[in-house]
Structures are given as C-alpha cells and as structure tokens.
Amino acid sequence: MTAASTSKWGLITNVVNSIVGVSVLTMPFCFKQCGIVLGALLLVFCSWMTHQSCMFLVKSASLSKRRTYAGLAFHAYGKAGKMLVETSMIGLMLGSCITFYVVIGDLGSNFFAPLLGLQVTRTVRVFLLFAVSLFIVLPLSLQRNMMASIQSFSAMALLFYTVFMFVIVLSSLKHGLFSGQWLRQVSYIRWEGVFRCVPIFGMSFACQSQVLPTYDSLDEPSVKTMSSIFASSLNVVTAFYVMVGFFGYVSFTDATTGNVLIHFPSNPVTEMIRVGFVMSVAVGFPMMILPCRQALNTLLFEQQQKDGTFAAGGYMPPLRFKVLTLSVVFGTMVGGVMIPNVETILGFTGATMGSLICFICPALIYKKAHKNAPSAQVVLWVGLGILVVSTLTTLSVTEEAPLDLTQEARSGHRGDAEGAMKVEAARLSVQDPVVVVAEDSQEKLKPAEDKEVLEQAQIKGPVDVPGGEAPKEKQEAAQLDRPGQGIAVPMGEAHRHEPPIPHDKVVVDEGQDQEGPEEKKPPPRLPDEGDPAGRGQGAPPLPESEKEKQEPERGGEGKRPGQVLAVGETEHPQKVPEANGQPPVQPRKEDSRPGNRDPQPAAQARDSVELKALAADDGREPAQKAGGALWKPVESAAESDAGGKAGLPVQRPEAAEQREKKEAEQQGGDQAGSKLEAEIKKLVAEAGRAEMLDHAVLLQVIQEQQVQQKRLLDQQEKLLAVIEEQHKEIRQQRQEGEEDKPKPADVQPEPGVAVLRGQEEEAEHAGETLGDDPSQPLQPVLGAPRGRPAPSQDMGQHLPGEVKVLPGRDLADLPAGGSETEPQGAPIDLREDPKAAIKAAGAGKELVPGDLEAVHKAAPPEVPKSPEKQVAKAVAGQRQDVFGEGSEERKETGKEAMAPGADTQKEAVQPLVGAEAKDTKSRQSGPTKAPVQTQAKFHPEPQAIFDTGQGSHPEVRSEAPRAVHIPPEEQHKGKGGAAIQEAKQRPDPNSGPKLAVPAGQKPENAKPNRDLKVQAGSDLRRRRRDLASHPEQELAPKDGVIISFNSLPNVQVNDLRSALDTQLRQAAGAALQVVHSRQIKQLSGDLEEA
C-alpha cells in the first residue's frame, strides 16, 4: 500500500510538472482580461474539461489496446485521424518551445545584460537565445533516455514554482493587498476577454501528450487509478494558477502584462526567480521536444505496419535523431526571436493546436466508441468554439502587439525592464479603453482619438522614452484604425509593407494581377476581382505547395502577410495563361483526372480478360486475346499515368511570373487604391479556399489510386513475362520433338471429362480451322462463339450426316461447332447419289481415313490422292497437338485402322468424295498448323484433351460401326475413338478431369506407337481387301478384346488400379456406343442399297 501510494504521488508530481510551464506567467494578464471571478471560473471549467479529455483517452486506450495518441486516432478515424493528431501535436510542442524561448529572451536578457554592462537590445536577446539553445537545450535534447534525468528536475522545478508563488503573494502584500485600494482598480467579470483567455487557460492545462505514457507506466493500469492521479494533479495546478493570477493581478492591476516577471523590481530575490525560471524552462525543453520528435518521425518516416499500427516508439536512426532534434531546437529559436511577447504565441497556439489536442481530438475519439456521451459533446463543442472564435479574437487583438514591441526593440527604446514595463502598460491601456476592449478590431475614429490621449498620458511618464514617440504612436493609431472599416488583418500587412513604397507596390501587384492582360489598368481590376476568385474556386490547387500554404492561412488569416501573397502568387500563374489565349490550366488538370482514373477501368478490364483466359476451356484463342489485351492496357495505362502527371503545367508558371513582373514594372507607379484592392483580394481568396482545399484532397486521393494501379500493373507485367517465358519453352520443346511426331496411340480419355460439351466442340474445330487457313494462323474467327475459331467446313459436312446416324448425339452441340459453315448440305447431296459415292470410293480406295480429319475443306473435287499424301496429311494433323501430341497421333492411327471397313460400306464412302477433293489443300495446310500450337501455351492441359477429341471425333463416328474382322488391337483403337465420342456426349460424374501428359513424357509414350504406325501402314491394303469381302451385317469375332497392352491412357492417376479401372470404363462405354451406332448405320445402308 505504501509503495503504491508513493508511486502514485511520484506520478502526480511528474504530471504537475508537465502541466505547469511558462503559461503561469500569463495568469495575471488573463485575470485582468476576464476579471477575477470569471477568470477563476474559467480556470475551473478548463480543468474539468482537461480531466474529461484525459479520461476519454484512457478509456479509449483500454478498449482498443492502443498505447499512443496517434494510434488511438488511427484506430478511430484511420489515416486522417492519425495525421490530424500528429500535426496538432507537432504544432503544440513547437508553440510551447517558441514560448520557452520568448520567456528566456525576456527574462534572461533583462538579467544578463546589466551584469555585462550592456543595453538590452535585440542583438543581446538573439545572442542569449542562441547560447542557451546551443549549450543547454541541445545537449539535453540529444540524450536518448531523457526521462531519468528529467524526473530529477521535476521536484526542483516544483520547488521553484512554489517560491515563485510566494514571491507573487509577497508582491501583492507590498502593493497594498489589505489596504483595499485594488478593490476599486480591478474588474471582476469582463466578458470581452473570454475568448482571448480560454485558449491560454486550455493550453495551461495541456497534458494530453503525457496521459498514455503515464497510463503505460502504471504497475496495474486502470481507468480509476488514472482518474484519481489526474484529478489530483489538475486540482493542484488549478489552485496554483488561481493564486498566481489573483495575487499578480492585485499587485499590478491594469499595468499587468503577459509576462508578469517583467514588473518585478530588480533585487536579488526577483533576479534569482528570473534565473530559476530561465533554467527550469531550459530544462523543461526536452519534455516538449521528445513527443515532438517522435511525432515528426512517425509523420515523415515511419510506415504503417501490417497490423495497422505505427512504430511510434521504435528505434530512430542516429542521423535522423540528430537532424530532427537540431531542426526543432533551432527552428523554434528562430520563432522565439521573431515573436516578442508571450501571450500572443500562447494564445494562438492554444486556440489552434491546443484546442485540437486538448479537447477536440479526445472527444472525437471517445465519441467513435461511445455513441451517447454528453460530456464528450460539451468538450467537443467548446473546443470547436475555442478553435474558431479564439483564433480570430487572438489574431485581431494582438495584430498591433508585434508592431509596438518590435519597433521599440529596433529603436532601442527597451533600455531596461522598467522601460519595457511602461511600453507594455501603454499598449495594454490602448487595448483596454473604458470597457471597449471587444471592439479593438473594429474601432472607429473617435475611440482612436481616445487612444491617443491615453497613450500620451501614460507614455510621457518614463524618462527613457524619447519625445518623438508620441507622433509615432499617433501615426500607428491612425493606420491601425483604418482596417477598422470591417477587416483588421489586411491593413496590418499594408502598414507593415508600406515604408519601402516601390517594393510594396510590386508585391501587391503580384497578388492582384490575376487576369494578366497588359491593357488592363488598376481601376477596371476592381470589378474583375470576382472573376478570378470564381475561377480560383473551381481550379484545383497544386496538391503539395498549395496545401502547405493554405493550412497556416486557414488557421490564422493575416497572421503572416507573406502567406497570403504566396498563395496569390501560386494561384495566379495558373490563371494568367487563360486570359492570354493560351490553353487554360484548369481544363488541363481536369482532363488529367480522367487520365488518373483511367488505370482503374483498364486494370478491371485486364482482370476480367485474364480471368476469362484462365477459366476458358479453349486455351488458344482467348489466351492469345488476353495476351494482346493485357499488353495494350499496360501501355495505355502508362501513357495515361504519364499524361495525368504531365498534365500539370510546369513551365507556364514561369512565363506567368515573368508576365506579372512586366506588368508590375509597368504599373509600379499606380498606387491609388492599392491597399483597398489588397483587402478585396484577400477576402475573395479566402472565400475560395475551402473549395480549393477540397480539390486538393480529391487530387491527393486520385494520386493514391494511381500508385495502387501502378502496383497492379507491375504485378500483371510480371505475370505476362512469366507466361512469355513458358511460351518460349513450350515452343522450343515442340521444335525439338517435331522429329518424333508420327506416333500412333490408342489412348482414350476417360469418359466424363469435366468440360462443357459445347465448348469442347468449339475447341475441336478451332485447330482445324486455324490449321487449314494459313493466312490467319493466330487470329480468331469473328463468327465463332466466345471468340473461339469458327469450325471448319469439313466438320459441317460430317455433322448433318451424323445427326441421322447417331440418335444419342446431342443436337445442341452441332450448331455450336458448325452453324456458320457453308457446305453443310454436301453430305445430303452425296447421299442422294450413292453411285457417285461408290465411284469416289473406287478412286480413293487406298485413302487413309486419317485424312478425313482435316481434309474436308472445299477445293477442286477432282484431285486424286496417294498414300504419300495420306502420310503427309497424318503428319500435318499430328502437328495440331501441343501437349497431347502422343494422344493425337495414337487416335489418328486408330482411324487409319478403321478405314478399311469404311471403304467397303456405301454410306461410309460418301464423305470421301469431299475429302478426295481436298487432299491437296490439306497438304498445303499441314505445315501451317504449327502456329496453332502457339495459342495453346496459356492452357496446355485442356488443349490436349480438345485435340484428342478433334483428331478422332468425326471419322470414328462414321466409320467405326462397320469395322468387321479387325485385328484385336485395331478393333480396340476403334472402340477408343467411340469412347471419345461417348465421353463427350455423356460426361461421367464419377470421373475427374483428364489432364494431358507433360511434354517430357511424350517421347517415351510415343516410341511403341511409332512402330504400330509403320505396321499399320504396311498392312493397309491387305486389310482393306479382307474387309471388303465380309458382309456388312457380320460382326468382328474378336470384339471381346477391351484392354490392349499398349501404353496406358494419359490419365494422371496415382496407381495402376485406377488407370485400369478408368480404361475399363472407357472401353465399356465405347462398346455400347459402337453396337448402337452400328445397328443404325446398317439399317440406313440397307435402305440406300435397296
């Protein structure tokens, strides 16, 4: 229990030290702005809101198991939430560091300059800041494990703050706390200063960046423990702030400035306090730099992990660590040199980044997990109000503060602490006339005159202030009141740029010459102001530079005059070419967007084509088409990407800038109305800023999509390269194996090959059409369904006859293969003239039926045939197979064996008449069939199956039924062909898909088949004479042979038993089909003989 309480109080000490900072110096000033009662109430309210927001973070962390602020935001709102939190955290820490430097410059220069006998000048201040940052802040910040050394300073810093509070109390006693004079000099409730003080109060309690590290450091993390720790810490800090604010305001009343230590007289105690404050602030730097450096690291360098988290606390490389630390330390030092007073930077940072980090983001994160959270609603809306109203109030009220103090510093008016106090008092009294503080940004001329009187009354008091200051103050008052016509921001800039008149005119003209034509004079430019602004609303800005310039602009309009001009300069080069007749920039950008979006449809088209190519049963034509479609969109997408990026003009802004410079030189003398035009320009530019930011966001999203599309394109190009390599290897293997092509085989695919029958038919005919048409070896025929090649005409000749002969044939398959072929009626005419068919049979008696496969194209019908031609045709038919070469040749040999029976039948002779006339064409087309193989590279396995069917399908159905007295192995081959037909007509549900034998196995399977081919050719005439003598009705006595001892079918199975069972099933189906079709053909043959 004691250890737990000790660790708890240690954590409370750390939290209090992280909360209390230089903002305590501004508490008397805030009490002066709001009044004592209202100031105390606002402090209590901000303390409650800070506690609520800390609990929001703790509860969200316990639910989502995330332990970083950015991780919580990413979990709730994705990458946008993470970016918002990181940028806000960076801004808050940078603002705190700048505040530290301002305090060091104010207090340290007032302490060290008198010791060294120097005047408190700007040079002394800059030198002091550089020395402190180089010798104190930088070494502390470069330590990697700073927390151990920082904790040792926590107790010391708290002791110092306690001493500081007692000094404030003693000062109030000295200034008559009990005399009661202050009761009439102080104010109790002043609503005018609420929106100026609330952001300072909110930032004074800012500890959200320390919530999750503290939660992680607990031995037993729990929401209840965290709530008690932060409640105790915030109560201590609230009491401390109220005491310092009250006693400081009572001590100095209306003379209270933003840094209350400036008012203290120079004595050893106050000097010790000042030095102690400087040291505590310098030592507290690492507390601000640590989270700022981590946020910069994750924002700029760290990538998102696979689990969606970011390595926020990971190891940082030494070079990056040093570069980030140096950038933060010296960058904020420059800011401390440029911004002279504490309340300005504290108010602005608290109103913008402080409200986001302290109130808005925690409330949004908590609302994401808990829908009904009234406290989150309150915190959210108060934070939004601070963000909007307080930012405007702070900027409008303090616009003149940098002018006063910088001019005083440049002129050497800040002789010592007393002189600085008087200047501050004079400036504060100007801001605070009798209850007119809220109207500072819109004061009229009479209040300006009152200001004059007040200034003269209070500034003439100090001896150090020269007498020429009153006219200066008068001039400033007159100039600063001119924007009181409604806008406070632009005239501050005009005043700031006014002394060098020619330079001022050039700058303003650069910001105003939107239209760019040289003929236009400044007076007509006023009515045209709306036109460029309207165009500016529609024109999407450049994504990076524009957004970077707009973000600070939206946060504080008019805070930085150069930013408005910079935005104008970036906008105008885009608009000037429009007025001069050049192609406008805006359409270029809008045209580039379709180019940017183009890769997405292109990639979708490629995906669909590739899926079709992978899923298509015919592996030749769709794959080739997919190849063409895949290559073209890659190029077009690359062109569109290049077009989308090159669409942004690169050289035109240069020409526009030159044109603007010329116009600025021409119009340099026209100064009438330049300031009023600057005001109008800024108003109009601000009006279009929101829409321009939307365009920028949209453009960024499109660019992210482009990156994703490019990745997809790269992957698809790699896939295509792999496919091309496979294609080349296949072609080489085919060329090597062409020597061993003429190989017979009796392989039958198992029945029920798992492919759609209509697509099989189309695949069967595709090779023949392409092989017989050498002029179009690789192009798909337009009429073919699904982009496949149209079937050949010889298939059209066979199929109508087979409709009569085979009742088991699926009629739906026939139109798919031969619906668009011309000579479908040829076999019917031949059937009507059986004598002509018999003549053709006598003339082509030696014809090998293997020619029937691809010989039936229309050609001069009188060309005779010879066995040499038949052999050439057989070789040509075998070239159509790519992976299934062995099976193709085996089937052709089977068809040759079946041919003698076909020659003896009248009806079977009829197709030979057309085939006889086409032998020469088949010989020509034989060599051209080799290119067909290139199309099968995408899907080799299905292609082998389809070529198998293609080689055996037509002839076996017509000739096999009359195979009488065929030797057993030849009879088996005929049955194998019928089995192929049966397999295509009736897929067996029990059998799996048949795959082709790999190319490496072809030579082994093909050698015995080549011997069979030679044997079959030698016995061809003898078999035909024997078969011619048998009667048509006689069946072969050796039909019982089902399984031959040739090589097993090309079925990829794991054991011999499965292969035998597959072959048995095929043979059984083939036998049934052969008997059935034989009876039907015998009946039709008898009818024709009669």
Swiss-Prot record:
BP GO terms, sorted: amino acid transport; bone development
Stretch forming the signal peptide: none
GO-annotated cellular components: Golgi apparatus; membrane
Pfam families, sorted: Aa_trans
Membrane topology label: Multi-pass membrane protein
Tissues in which the protein is found: Expressed in neurons, astrocytes and epithelial cells scattered throughout the central nervous system structures including striatum, ependyma, cerebral cortex, hippocampus, hypothalamus, thalamus, pons, and cerebellum (at protein level). Highly expressed in paraventricular hypothalamic nucleus, suprachiasmatic nucleus, anterior hypothalamic area central part, in lateral ventricule and in dorsal 3rd ventricule (at protein level). Expressed in choroid plexus epithelial cells (at protein level).
Family: Belongs to the amino acid/polyamine transporter 2 family.
Keywords from the UniProt entry: Amino-acid transport, Membrane, Phosphoprotein, Transmembrane, Transmembrane helix, Transport
Positions of modified residues (Phosphoserine): S441, S608, S636, S887
Keyword hit for Transmembrane helix: yes
Name of protein: Solute carrier family 38 member 10
Main location: membrane
UniProt keyword annotation of Membrane present: yes
Protein task: Facilitates bidirectional transport of amino acids. May act as a glutamate sensor that regulates glutamate-glutamine cycle and mTOR signaling in the brain. The transport mechanism remains to be elucidated.
Modified residues (Phosphothreonine): T769
Subcellular location per the Swiss-Prot or TrEMBL entry: Membrane
Alphabetical list of InterPro entries matching this protein: AA_transpt_TM (IPR013057)
Residue numbers spanned by region Disordered: 441-675, 729-831, 857-1037
Transmembrane segments: 9-31, 36-58, 84-104, 123-143, 153-173, 229-249, 272-292, 323-343, 345-365, 378-398
UniProt organism field: Mus musculus (Mouse)
Catalysed reactions, semicolon-separated: L-glutamate(out) = L-glutamate(in); L-glutamine(out) = L-glutamine(in); L-alanine(in) = L-alanine(out); L-serine(in) = L-serine(out)
Polar residues bias: start-end ranges: 923-936
Listed Basic and acidic residues bias regions: 441-454, 493-508, 517-528, 544-560, 587-596, 607-623, 654-665, 729-744, 758-767, 954-973, 1004-1013, 1026-1037
